Amino acid sequence: RKRYAMLIGLGTAEEVKITIGCVYERPEDAVMTVKGRDLKTGLPKEQSVTSLELMEAFKRPARQIVDEVLAVLELSSPELVADVARNGIVLTGGGCQLYGFDFLISERTEIPCTIADDPDSCVALGCGKSLEWINSMQEGTINLARRRLMKEG
């Protein structure tokens, strides 16, 4: 929108993200033609977009996610961090399917990363499973935000 003064629909944006989106440089820059509406004239417009442009757009949110992964590791017990280092990190959710997310996190954490077999469904299934155990969880079992606040305060 900002770079090309062009408006595209959510479906088109999702298609571009899935097709050529990346957070780590691809071996070859991918290009996709996008159709939308010119914000200056209101007329239809076509524009070629590259994976390098998308990587630049995703840089800040990707960095924030990696920083959160590092923060969780820092706040976790040594035993848990050792288990994660031994077994690796499994990425879930739609965003992890962006090209290179596993490489980026692995590079920053120095821990091997893999993408779950069905990353889109894993988050929902995991939430459902956690509800089955909610009554048996102890207070603070997964309260990392509280630990972070205590550490900063």
What are these language model-derived features?
Residues R1, I111-I115, I142, L149-E152:
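Short beta-alpha connecting loops at secondary-structure transitions
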Residues R1-K59:
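Phosphate-binding glycine-rich/basic clefts of nucleotide- and phosphate-handling proteins
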Residues G9, A13, E28, K129, ...:
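Acidic, glycine/GT-rich loop-and beta-edge segments that sit at the periphery of enzyme/chaperone cores
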Residues V16, V69, L91, C127:
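Residue-level signature of catalytic and energy-coupling elements of molecular machines
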Residues G21, E25, V81-I105:
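Glycine-rich phosphate-binding loops at beta-strand->alpha-helix junctions
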Residues T33, V90, T114-I115:
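Structured core elements
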Residues A57-A85, S130-W133:
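Phosphate/ATP-binding catalytic cores across multiple sugar-kinase/actin-like superfamilies
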Residues F103-K129, W133, M137:
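Conserved phosphate-binding/catalytic loops in two-lobed NTP-binding clefts
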